[in-house]
C-alpha cells in the first residue's frame, strides 16, 4: 500500500479560495485545522479538483494563511461520508514550527537558528501566566493572538545571556519560589539569549563526590571577587570541607581547582595535613607527628648500637651476614657478649660437653638459662628484662609440641615457656606420673597416640613406623633398669635432650 501523496495544487487553490471567502465574511478560524459541521460555502469550490480526478466531493473547512503556506491539508467533515484525507507530508518540516523545541526551553538546543522546531516562547509564557488556555487558543473561540505577540525590546535587551544563567546552579531557588516560576524565568533568559549553544558548551564539569545542584538558576547579584586562599578558608570553616586525600599524601593533580580542602604543610611530616583555621586539629596532628618521630629516633639508635657488633664465635658482623635469617642477635640473659642466633644455638646444643659448660657464655663462662633472639642489640639491664618478658609472653601463646603428643606431660615441666593444652576432641586429661608407677608412665608415653577419630602413629610411612617401634622397645628396656642404676643430673638432662631430638624427628 503506497503512502498518500502531498496535497495537490488544485486542492491548495481550493483551500486558498475558501480561506479568502471566510476572511471577507469576517469569520476567523482557530490555529489548527478543525472540521466544521457543514461545508456549504466550501463545497462547490473544493469539489471541482476531486471531480476532475474521479474523487467524491467533500466539504473543506477554511484554512488559516500560515497553514496554507505550509501545505497542510484540512480535515474532512465528519458527516461528509467521503474518503479520509491523506496525512500531511513531513518532508517540508513546516509543521514542526508549531511545536516548541524542548531543548530550547532548557537552554540546551545545539541547532540554533537551524532548528526545525519553534524557538518562540511568547505563547508559552502567556499560557503559563493565564494558566487555562493552551498556546494558540483563546477563551472566547476567537483568533489566538499569542502566536503573533513578540517579547518587548526592553526585556530582550535587559535579559542576561543564557550561558551565564547556567554557570553555577543553586538548589534552593526553585524550591522557594516554585518550580514553574523558576522555569518561566529561565525560559525568558533562554529566549533573550537566542540559541542555547553557549549554555551547554560552558556547563560546569561533573566531579565525583560533588553535591547535586539543581537545573535552574536563582537570580542573585554577583559577589565581589575574593582571593582563592580567603575563599577556601571561609568554605572550610563554614561547610566543614574534608581534606583532599591526594594532597594529604603527596600531590593533588587538580591543584587549586580541587573541591576538597588543601591544608597547610606540616614541618614534621611534610604533608598538607594542617587545617588552616582549626587550632585543635593542628595541635593534635603535631603531637602525633612528634610521637612518631620519637619512635623513629629510638629505632634508629637501636640499629646504630648493633651496626658494628661482631659474633664472638664466627667473628662476622651480625648485620652483614649473607643469610637474612642469621642477621639476629642471640641475647644471653646473664651476659653482655654479642653472638648471632645461629652460632649460640649451635653452641648450646653440643652434647660432647657437660650441661653447665654448654649453658655458659663461650667467652666469660657465665651461665645463662635463656637465649632470646632479637633484631636489635640490647645491653642495658632494664631493656634486657623487658625483652625477656616480651619473649615469654610471645611463647606462652604457642602450643607445646611435647605436651599434647606426650599425653599431658612435657619433659621441661613447669620451666617450659610454651602453652600446655589439649587439642579439641581429645576428651579428658590423661593421668599424670602420680597415677601409677614410673615405668608404667613411660611405657604409656611411647605407645601409639589416639589422634582425632582414628588410631594412627606419628606418621604413616612404613620406615618411621619401624623406627618408632624400635625406640619403644629401647625405652622400655632402659626404664626397667632405672631403679637399679644411679643417674646424675647431667645424665637426666641428656635424656631430656635426646627425647626432644627424638620427638623432633618423629613429629
Curated annotation (Swiss-Prot):
* Coiled-coil region list: none
Tissue-by-tissue expression:
Ubiquitous.
Task: Give residue spans, biased composition: Low complexity.
Answer: 1-21
| Record EC number | 2.3.2.27
InterPro entries in the record: MKRN-like, MKRN1_C, Znf-CCCH_4, Znf_C3HC4_RING-type, Znf_CCCH, Znf_CCCH_sf, Znf_RING, Znf_RING/FYVE/PHD
A GO cellular component annotation here is: ribonucleoprotein complex
Catalytic activity of the protein: S-ubiquitinyl-[E2 ubiquitin-conjugating enzyme]-L-cysteine + [acceptor protein]-L-lysine = [E2 ubiquitin-conjugating enzyme]-L-cysteine + N(6)-ubiquitinyl-[acceptor protein]-L-lysine
Q: Return one GO MF term.
A: ubiquitin protein ligase activity
The pathway that the record names for this protein is: Protein modification; protein ubiquitination
Subcellular location field:
Nucleus
- List the RING-type ZnF regions, as residue ranges: 311-365
Q: SUPFAM superfamilies, alphabetically? A: CCCH zinc finger, RING/U-box
Which Pfam family is one of this chain's hits?
zf-CCCH_4
Which stretches of sequence are listed as region Disordered? 1-48, 69-89, 126-149
**Gene Ontology biological-process annotations:** protein polyubiquitination; protein ubiquitination
Q: What is its main location?
A: nucleus
The record, for PANTHER family, names: E3 UBIQUITIN-PROTEIN LIGASE MAKORIN-3-RELATED, MAKORIN-RELATED
Tell me, in a sentence or two, what this protein's role is.
Answer: E3 ubiquitin ligase catalyzing the covalent attachment of ubiquitin moieties onto substrate proteins. Acts as a key developmental timer that helps ensure puberty begins at the appropriate age, by inhibiting premature activation of the reproductive hormone cascade. Epigenetically regulates GNRH1 transcription by disrupting the binding of methyl-DNA binding protein 3/MBD3 to the promoter of GNRH1.
Disease with which this protein is associated in UniProt: Precocious puberty, central 2: A condition defined as the development of secondary sexual characteristics in boys and girls at a chronological age that is 2.5 standard deviations below the mean age at onset of puberty in the population. Central precocious puberty results from premature activation of the hypothalamic-pituitary-gonadal axis.
Remarks, miscellaneous: Imprinted, expressed from the paternal chromosome only. A deficiency of MKRN3 is not sufficient to cause Prader-Willi syndrome (PWS).
> What is the name listed in the Swiss-Prot or TrEMBL entry for this protein?
E3 ubiquitin-protein ligase makorin-3
